[in-house]
Amino acid sequence: MLDPRRVFRKIVSWSLEAKFRASDFFVLAVYGAVVGFGIWHHEPWSDEALPWMIARDTDLRGFFDLIFHNWDRHPGLFHTLLLPFVKLGLPYFTQAVLNGFFALAAAFLFMAKAPFPRIFRYLFLFSYYMLYEYSVITRPYMLAILLLFVIAAFYSKRSERPLMYAVLITLLLHSDYIVFGLAAGLIGAFIFEHRSEIGKNRRLWGPLAIMVLNAAWVFWMGRSLPPSHHEYGQKLIFNIQNITQAIANAFSPFADQVIYSSFILPAALWGGVLILFLVFVSMRKNLPSVLILGSSLSYLIFVFTFLHKGDYRHHGFIFLSVIFTLWITAEPPAAERAGRTLPGWFNARAVAISILSLFLVLGLQNDFFVYQQEYFLPFSGAKDMAHAIRQLEKEHNIFEKGYVVVASHKKSVALMPYLPGVKFWNPCEGDYAPYYVNTKTLAACAELSLYDVILRTRRHFGDLSKVLFLFERPLPIEKDENYEYQKVYAAGAGVFGYMYETFYLYHPQAKSLGYPRRVL
């Protein structure tokens, strides 16, 4: 006969165990299946298109010119990894598959190497950030997370193999600017730990030079926007809400979107502050770890306060900085912990992990919410509209007949990966524009009224009979004194993703010629 108490003790023991067992592969398989489902149903938005377009539509010189001049506001590691896939002519979906591979590799490393209770590792894998934001939406962030976890797993060997450590830090620096503060903290901590050896041990000189020079290079790239870039010279006015929102979002995404947000948002904020306090308390005798977390948080808070207020994908790195620092911070010997009371090292760590676990449990509803949205609704209307344009070409040979697609909004780049060989004409540039080069002119064009777009196009082409207007919103009145504007297709009903990317395709019909049948 089963002893309930014994069964309960076994369940608790299994839940708190920090080892990796063969049975954990089942959870990894479930994680991979869910992420794969999300990737399959996801419609990429304009930001996801940028790395692919930069890799596809530039030669090698142009590619590195765009990266070094920071046009995409991300370092070039992710873009560089895309190059062979793009140049081999593989489909756009390859980018999402690659990101899914990064997610699965990061999940395996976390499950196998992270020194956390099993239940916490499971909850982390199925958090909103790991299950959706970074794994399904393809940006450079998942690559940065994978490198963070590789560094965490390697961290205990940093003194034995400093060159490999320097290579990993360099890759992290070039993965994304969002982790610059964390990488800088890791470099500073390494220097602090080896301060007495640096002058004597030449073996450290090369690795240190690699890390410091790459940090300086990435910092220079990040701050060196071309004057024609649409974000050049932009600064945020100080707003304390940018900081409080970032902390709340880091530990409880969508806290500001629910019915009881007036209660949940402050709870998420103060819960996040308490977690940060407890983590610092738990590391108070480990100065390198304090330096690493402090550097990352200081950098992120500076960015969110003065440069870019960020969104979930940015705020999540506060949460990830905490996870990373807890991972690499070794527990003191049992004898040293003996007799300690709150807020002692082990207790503070345990309480912080417990509160984090509570947030993760409460956040499971976010997974259901976003996956339900992905299944029933489009994240962006770009894929649907691109399919409609391809169908027009297939049925009516519009591009062979000399038709031109006019697009004024920068988010039109979201369609371009699906339309190889097709270029959009921009009324502000007066030419076929590379929509992945976000100039002030291109950004200003997005603010034009739809009638100004039509007017500029008419001035350039004269006859509009072979023009297709790609708008981000419907025309208020679909006619003027010369043309009736036939709505050929509308894409994006129910769009729920970033920027709510909807697209409307119009074909001008000269009034004197009557109205031919609809193309679609």
Residue positions per predicted region:
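Transmembrane signal-anchor helices characteristic of membrane glycosylation enzymes that use polyprenol
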Residues: F20-E48, A209-L225, I301-F302, L364
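Signature aromatic-anchored transmembrane alpha helix within multi-pass, membrane-resident enzymes
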Residues: F26-V27, P207-V212, A334-F368
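Membrane-interface alpha helices of multi-pass inner-membrane proteins
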Residues: A33-V35, M130-Y132, F149-I151, P162-G188, ...
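Short hydrophobic/aromatic helix or loop-helix immediately within or flanking a transmembrane segment
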Residues: P51-R56, R61-V97, F101
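Transmembrane-helix motifs of polytopic, lipid-linked glycan transferases
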Residues: V97-Y122, L276-V279
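Short acidic/glycine- and proline-prone juxtamembrane loop motifs at membrane-interface regions
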Residues: V136-M142
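Membrane-embedded, lumen/periplasm-facing catalytic core of multi-pass transferases
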Residues: V361-M416, V422-G430, L520
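Luminal/periplasmic acceptor-recognition loop/helix of membrane-associated glycosyltransferases
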Residues: K394-K401, A407, G421-L520
